[in-house]
Structures are given as structure tokens and as C-alpha cells.
Amino acid sequence: MALELALDLQFAVNPGNLPTEAEFETWVRVALGDTLDEAELTIRIVDATESQQLNRDYRGKDKPTNVLSFPFEAPPGMELPLLGDLVICASVVENEALEQHKALEAHWAHMVVHGCLHLLGYDHIDDAEAEEMEALETTLLTGLGYPDPYKEQ
């Protein structure tokens, strides 16, 4: 059965140089795979100021970051398709792509996949979790035709 996806894209920056809605949807669908029958999530594209504020308020890090994930936790006994929210900072993604010599589209795909995996419960706090998450990201992204995001460019 195909994933029934409700994707809410919010642009708090000029969407001129950003991926298309179709690209975002493709990346989300690939990241979620066949783990769910239906899912709802929001992806908000923000500037460095908003990213820094959220990163400071929720993670205690006073700097903008590439992607923040906010998983939705349903009350016990309630089954809801809400996955949560991703907040992606456009300028950080662009700067990282330049610094790391990556194609901008490939880095956007990586950030969306990475964030979605966090919403599914993956993490990279310890080495074993990081290896598992990075291996899955690499498999998903190379399956889309992008290079391994963890390989030196």
C-alpha cells in the first residue's frame, strides 16, 4: 500500500533557490519508506535568525543549524499519523554544500532524509546509532542517485 502523505511546506524565506515541492515529497517518501501507511509532517524553511533562536531554545546551542526535528508524541492510547516538524535553515544548507563541495540538491535531499529519520526515532548520539543512521541515509540517498553524503568530496 502506498504511503498517504500530508506534507505541509512553509517558507519563511524567499523560495527562489529552494527545492520544489515535488522534490521535498520524493525525499520524504523515500525516507519514510514502507514504515507507515499514512503520515503528516511539516517542513519549515527558515532563515539563520529563526534557526538560531529555535536551536538555542530547544537544544541550548546559540547558533543556526542545518535541520531541527520536532517529533510529535501522541498521548498514550492515541494513534495519530502526525510525525512532527522539520525546520531547515536554507542559508546553513547552502553554506555547508559549498564548504563540503556537495551539489546543493544532494545536500537538501540529505537534510530532509536525515530529519525524517529523526522523526522516525533514529539518532546519532552514540557511535553505534550514528553508524546505523548514516548507513541508512547513504543507502537511501544513493538509491536516489546522489553520492554518499559521508564520503569526502
UniProtKB/Swiss-Prot annotation:
Annotated keywords: Cytoplasm, Endonuclease, Hydrolase, Metal-binding, Nuclease, Ribosome biogenesis, rRNA processing, Zinc
Domain of life: Bacteria
Record GO terms (molecular function): metalloendopeptidase activity; RNA endonuclease activity; zinc ion binding
Gene Ontology CC: cytoplasm
InterPro entries registered for this protein in UniProt: MetalPrtase_cat_dom_sf_prd, YbeY, YbeY_CS
Cofactor note: Binds 1 zinc ion.
Localization terms from the record: Cytoplasm
Required cofactor names: Zn(2+)
EC assignment: 3.1.-.-
Residues involved in Zn(2+) binding: H114, H118, H124
Protein's GO biological process: rRNA processing
Function summary: Single strand-specific metallo-endoribonuclease involved in late-stage 70S ribosome quality control and in maturation of the 3' terminus of the 16S rRNA.
Family, per entry: Belongs to the endoribonuclease YbeY family.
PANTHER family: ENDORIBONUCLEASE YBEY, CHLOROPLASTIC
The protein's name: Endoribonuclease YbeY
